[in-house]
Each structure stands twice: as C-alpha cells, then as structure tokens.
C-alpha cells in the first residue's frame, strides 16, 4: 500500500462513520508557545479537547503535519524522522472507548482497508496506579472483539498513559495496538514491550479523561474525548514489508535523485547511507517549513534557526558525498513528486522554496569555508582535547558557525566541547542584545493622527500588492508608521527590480483610484483565518479579533485605525527599497496629496 493510498483509505473510512474531514493545521502552533512546531497530531486540537466547540462538529478526521527536532542528531539512522504525518480521528464527546476501539479494529482487519488478520493483533492497556484506576473497560472491549486475554497486556504509565504535552493539560490512558510481524522471538521473554522488531506498534488510541493541573493533580474532564494517532511513515513501512521508512515511497524519489547527483548507490556503504538519509530527511522537512503559510525563513532565532540548522546540516552531508553547490534545490522536485496530490502548497511555492534554499546554501558555503579554516586554526592552538566555551562561541558569533556544526567537527577531530561554557557566553550575548534592542525599531504606529491612519491603510495595500507581484511567500516582518512616512519590512530573498517596484506602486495607486471601502468586522480568529485574513507570524491574538477588509483586495487581522475609503489616501510613492536584514527587505513610502 502506497503513501497516498493509506492516507485516502483512512480519511474515507472515518468519513463513512460520520466524521468530518478537517484540514491539517500549520506546522507552526498557534495555541502553544512552549514549542516551536506542532509535534503531535493532537496539538492543534487542544482547545477543543478542553471543551471548546469545534465548528466542524464533534467527530473529526484529519492528517496533521508534524516536526520534531529534539532527536535531530539521531536523524540518519533507519528510523528517526524530522518531518512526519499523523493520521487522526477525534471524538469531542461523541463517543468514547468502546466505539473508538471498534473503529480501530474494523479499519485494521477489514478486507476493504488494511486487511490485517486479527490473529496477529496484540494490544496494551493502562494497568493503573495511585492516581488513575486500571483500564479494564478497554480490555473488555478488545476481548469482546476476539482478542484473547494472553494478547492483552496491562502496562505502566510509561507505556500506556498519554500526555499532557506540557506540564498541564488534557491527558488519559491509552491503548496501543501491535501487529506480530512474523519474525522469530529474540528470547523467551520477548513480548510487545521488546524492541527487537517482532511486534510493530501500528496505532495508539488516547482516551482524554483527565486534565492535569500545575500541582500534578488529575480532574475528570466533563466532556471525555478520543484522540487517536497513526504515523503514516511507520505504517507504510510495515505494510510495504520494508525494514526502514527510507526504503518506502515516502523517500524513494528523493533517494533516487541523490544517487543520480552524487553517483553513490544507497545500500552499499554505511557512512554514505547515513549521509543520504540525512539529506533526504532534511530536504523534506525544509520544503514543508518553507511552504508553510507562516513563511518561516532561515534565521538565527526560533523556527528560523531550526530551519537554518537542518538546511545547513543537509549541505554538510551533501558535501561529504561530493555533491556540488546548489544541490538542495535540485531535490525539491522529488519532494513535490511524493506529496503533490495532497499538499498543493509544495507546487504553488516550489520556485520560492528553491530560491530560498539557494540563498541559504550560498551563505552557508561562505560560512563553512571561513568557519572550518578558523576551527582548525583554533584547535591547533589548544593544549588539550577540550574546546573551551569562548572558542565555540567565537565561531558562532564571529563566523556564524552553528554550535551543532562545531560539535560535529569536534567529534570528527577527536575533541569534546565545553557546552556549559558556550551556553554561558551565549546567555551574556543575549542579555546585551536585549538591552540594545529596546531602542531599535519594533514597528507600529507612532500616533493615531489622520495622516498616520492613512499611511496605515496604505500599508495594508502595500502588503497585498507585494504578495501579488513577488509571491504569496511575502509576509510582514515589521512596520513603523509616522505622520510623514511608512516603513515596511517583509521577507523576500532578493532586491526588488525597478519594474517590480513600479508594479507595486501602480497596483496600490489603482486601489486608491478605485475608491474601495474599508470595513471592520469582529470575529473568531479561526473564522478570520478561514476567510483568508492575513495574520502576523509570532503575534499572539485573542480568540476574538478585529478584521479590516479593503473591498475585494485585502483582508487582515488588525487593530486599526484605518480610513473609511482608499480614495482618501492620495498618491502612493515608494521612496526606497533596501535590505533590512538577512532575507528581509525594507520599503519606505509616502503619500502625496
């Protein structure tokens, strides 16, 4: 069974059971500031698991993009992935343990779906502890479906209790479903808790019964929910009879392309194989981050730093294989080939993704050349095999050399690093930067005079015009408006041409000439985003937001103020377009009466 087929069968099955298919959310969480990316299928639905009503109903099915970077140094083995997809079906109070288990059993065993013999199924349930009782209810449902007691395992909290994602939130017992692969037992003690590979965990059904508070106490949820998760990549590895996900159609087109470019053959050399897997994983993750609606770009902070790190790690391993410059962009088509039927954004933003990868690769090759040369000079001066924190920080601060790459180079040359020393220098650097940063441009309106208000409305027109001329990737990165001029920062990898500047100017002035009405409405944030309203990346909004729509042209989440009609603005003129920072451009513009 192929990747696309599994995804479709899952959605079709649960839709046939009355579930509503909902679109997966962005990789960037909008309701959890504790993590940089959505790392689990349930994360975007936490508010609804806690009691909010979902606009699509109480029985849902989705496919959620996820990204985990905690194990990034492990990526390159046969199993760890940065980007992955989670299939999920959800009950927000509509049904609970019995129906959830029965749905899972039917999908797994029905000849119309996965067609796995029930004689190969093993399950685990929560054994209970001093806080939460033993889950005999779920065990009884499994037994009623023909799973004998000797294939039902009661396991501890470590194995069969899920969540919360942070320290607090929804959580509960789960039941994990395993398939006997037919391999020989590794020992007489071999069972589903063994990591030898005989038993494959195919699905997990979480029963959100409780909410954990900040004191570690558990309170029963008024509305009990079901959250199930099936990892697509893991499942197709089993269904296709492969030993590794990298042997499946989730990666084969990418690996085929790497083989063609590098001249290396996957499966012939352990070191080369690891490099190929790292490149394949990281290019896929990079494509999905760059294609995301929030338009994350490589940088030295937050999500941008993660993106920069995985791009640069892929470049290093491509270099090890002897691959030439700008090779990552050549792999984008292979990622698109795998996912284009389901993720249209990979096709729509393909040119932008390639351009950003080339820009980052060009920057990094310069960094690598200078950084590696300096690294070798510095370690030659050391009297021990330990690299002090001030040296690793100097490589980071002066040469833009990521700590992780210094760490990898140190390992290659037989050195260790004083990580605590690096972190101490890094923290001091942050404190100094923060004090200085209090004085720099943060964006926003200097006042609410009529002239400033007009320029604020012009900024909305400019934002949309830039997207239409340069591409949908354009997002506001900063804004500063006075009564005399507007200053607008936006992400874009290249200097604008004179023709592009003129196109933007003309487009804004056309909207002014058309005398479009500017209307304000108040609505739920999710409704605003569904309506197509632009929102600022990283901005934390209330549940109810103000939305300004410029008739048929622009719609943004914004607090205002704005004029009533674009005809009030006068003539829009761009005075200057220049670089603001890496990957960010700045426009200065005025209005002429």
Curated annotation (Swiss-Prot):
Which GO MF terms does the UniProt record name?
alanine-tRNA ligase activity; aminoacyl-tRNA deacylase activity; ATP binding; tRNA binding; zinc ion binding
Q: Which UniProt keywords apply?
A: Aminoacyl-tRNA synthetase, ATP-binding, Cytoplasm, Ligase, Metal-binding, Nucleotide-binding, Protein biosynthesis, RNA-binding, tRNA-binding, Zinc
One GO term describing the cellular component: cytoplasm
Its UniProt entry gives the catalysed reaction(s) as:
tRNA(Ala) + L-alanine + ATP = L-alanyl-tRNA(Ala) + AMP + diphosphate
Per the UniProt record, one Pfam family is: tRNA-synt_2c
Quote the record's cofactor note: Binds 1 zinc ion per subunit.
Q: Where in the cell is it found?
A: Cytoplasm
Enzyme class per UniProt: ligase
* EC nos: 6.1.1.7
Q: Which SUPFAM superfamilies match?
A: Class II aaRS and biotin synthetases, Putative anticodon-binding domain of alanyl-tRNA synthetase (AlaRS), ThrRS/AlaRS common domain
Question: Binding of Zn(2+): at which residues?
Answer: 456, 460, 558, 562
Q: List the cofactors.
A: Zn(2+)
Please name the GO terms of the biological process aspect recorded for this protein, alphabetically: alanyl-tRNA aminoacylation
Q: What is known of its domains?
A: Consists of two domains; the N-terminal catalytic domain (in this organism this is shorter than usual) and the editing domain; the C-terminal C-Ala domain found in most orthologs is missing. The editing domain removes incorrectly charged amino acids.
Q: Which PANTHER family match?
A: ALANINE--TRNA LIGASE, CYTOPLASMIC, ALANYL-TRNA SYNTHETASE
What's its job?
Catalyzes the attachment of alanine to tRNA(Ala) in a two-step reaction: alanine is first activated by ATP to form Ala-AMP and then transferred to the acceptor end of tRNA(Ala). Also edits incorrectly charged Ser-tRNA(Ala) and Gly-tRNA(Ala) via its editing domain.
- What family does the database annotate? Belongs to the class-II aminoacyl-tRNA synthetase family.
Q: What is this protein called?
A: Alanine--tRNA ligase
Q: Which organism is it from?
A: Borrelia hermsii (strain HS1 / DAH)
What gene is this protein a product of?
alaS
């Amino acid at each position: 069974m192929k990747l696309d087929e599994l995804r479709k069968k899952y959605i079709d099955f649960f839709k046939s059971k009355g579930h509503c298919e909902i679109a997966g959310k962005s990789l960037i969480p909008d309701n959890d500031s504790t993590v940089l990316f959505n790392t689990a299928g349930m994360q975007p639905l936490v508010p609804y698991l806690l009691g909010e009503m979902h606009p699509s109903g109480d029985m849902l099915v989705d496919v959620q993009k996820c990204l985990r970077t905690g194990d990034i140094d492990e990526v390159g083995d046969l199993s760890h992935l940065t980007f992955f997809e989670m299939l999920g079906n959800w009950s927000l109070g509509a049904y609970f343990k019995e129906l959830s288990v029965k749905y899972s059993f039917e999908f797994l065993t029905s000849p119309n779906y996965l067609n796995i013999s029930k004689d190969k199924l093993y399950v685990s349930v929560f054994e209970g502890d001093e806080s939460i009782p033993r889950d005999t209810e779920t065990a009884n449902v499994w037994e009623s479906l023909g799973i004998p007691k000797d294939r039902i395992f009661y396991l501890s909290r470590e194995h069969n209790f899920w969540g919360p994602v942070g320290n607090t939130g929804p959580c509960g017992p789960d039941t994990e479903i395993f398939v006997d692969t037919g391999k020989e037992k590794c020992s007489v003690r071999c069972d589903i808790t063994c990591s030898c590979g005989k038993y494959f965990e195919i699905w997990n059904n979480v029963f959100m019964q409780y909410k954990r508070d900040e004191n570690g106490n558990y309170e029963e949820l008024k509305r009990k929910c079901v959250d199930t998760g099936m990892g697509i990549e893991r499942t197709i590895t089993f269904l296709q009879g492969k030993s590794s996900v990298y042997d499946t159609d989730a990666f084969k087109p990418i690996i085929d392309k790497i083989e063609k470019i590098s001249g290396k053959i996957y499966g012939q050399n352990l070191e080369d194989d690891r490099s190929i897997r790292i490149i394949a994983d990281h290019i896929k993750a990079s494509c999905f981050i760059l294609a995301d609606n929030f338009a994350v770009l490589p940088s030295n902070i937050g999500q941008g730093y993660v993106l920069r790190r995985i791009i640069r790690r892929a470049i290093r391993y491509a270099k090890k294989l002897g691959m030439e410059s700008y090779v990552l962009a050549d792999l984008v088509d292979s990622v698109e080939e795998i996912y284009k039927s389901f993720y249209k954004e990979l096709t729509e933003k393909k040119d932008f993704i390639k351009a950003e990868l080339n820009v980052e690769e060009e920057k990094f090759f310069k960094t690598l050349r200078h950084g590696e040369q300096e690294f070798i000079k510095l370690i030659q001066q050391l009297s021990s095999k330990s690299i002090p924190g001030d040296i690793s920080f100097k490589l980071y601060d002066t040469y833009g050399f990521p700590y992780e790459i210094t760490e990898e180079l140190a390992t290659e040359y037989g050195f260790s690093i004083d990580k605590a020393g690096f972190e101490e220098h890094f923290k001091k650097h942050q404190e100094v930067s923060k004090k200085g940063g209090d004085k720099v441009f943060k964006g926003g309106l200097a006042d609410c005079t009529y002239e400033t208000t007009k320029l604020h409305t012009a900024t909305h027109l400019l934002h949309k015009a830039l997207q239409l001329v340069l591409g949908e990737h354009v997002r506001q990165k900063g804004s500063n408006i006075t009564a005399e001029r507007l200053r607008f920062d936006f992400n874009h990898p290249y200097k604008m041409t004179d023709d592009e500047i003129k196109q933007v100017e003309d487009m804004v002035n056309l909207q002014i000439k058309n005398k479009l009405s500017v209307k304000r409405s108040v609505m739920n944030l999710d409704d605003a985003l569904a309506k197509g309203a632009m929102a600022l990346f990283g901005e934390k909004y209330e549940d109810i937001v103000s939305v300004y729509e410029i008739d048929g042209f622009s719609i943004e989440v914004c607090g205002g103020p704005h004029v009533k009609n674009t005809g009030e603005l006068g003539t829009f003129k761009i005075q200057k377009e220049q670089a603001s920072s890496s990957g960010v451009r700045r426009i200065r513009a005025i209005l002429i009466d």
